[in-house]
UniProtKB/Swiss-Prot annotation:
Residues 22-104 form the Lipoyl-binding domain. It comes from the Bacteria. One of its GO terms (biological process) is glycine decarboxylation via glycine cleavage system. This is Glycine cleavage system H protein. CDD domains: GCS_H. GO terms for cellular component: cytosol; glycine cleavage complex. The modification N6-lipoyllysine is found at residue 63. It holds the Pfam family GCV_H. Its cofactor is (R)-lipoate. Keywords: Lipoyl. Belongs to the GcvH family.
Length: 140
């Protein structure tokens, strides 16, 4: 599984990309694969303020429904309009066309607490080892 090096990650399997003074957020390939075919994505409204650690939406798949957690505090300035008609973009292109929202961070320093690609790769190895050790499928 390819982990884009330029992104930031969370242990909840979300990615963040800095674009100027904004941040784009989505879920990782690992999360999309664990969920299976995504059939619906519920996202916040533009201008909503998200709190770090709070839920901001739901991803529903053929296997499960999973909450989405905000990795940083900020104001929603855009959501991906394509996901309403084509939620499968989350599976097909999680780091590109499957992006979920764009935030204006309240405190950009919160990004410093996120995982690098290398740290996220190590986290995935820990998750996989746990699943093998205890004979469980990982679900989000």
């Amino acid at each position: 599984m390819s982990i884009p090096q330029e992104l930031y990650y969370t242990k909840d399997h979300e990615w963040l990309r800095k674009e100027g003074d904004e941040v784009v957020i989505g879920i990782t390939r690992f999360a999309a694969d664990q969920l299976g075919d995504v059939v619906f994505v519920e996202l916040p409204q533009v201008e909503d303020t998200l709190q770090m650690g709070g839920t901001f939406g739901v991803v529903e798949s053929v296997k499960a429904a999973s909450d989405l957690f905000s990795p940083i505090t900020g104001q929603v300035i855009a959501t991906n309009p394509d996901l309403a008609e084509a939620p499968e973009l989350v599976n097909e292109d999680p780091y590109g066309k499957g992006w979920m929202l764009r935030l204006k961070p309240e405190d950009p320093a919160q990004m410093d607490a996120l995982l690098t690609a290398q740290a996220y790769t190590a986290w995935l190895e820990t998750c996989s080892s746990f699943a093998v050790r205890f004979g469980q499928n990982l679900t989000l």
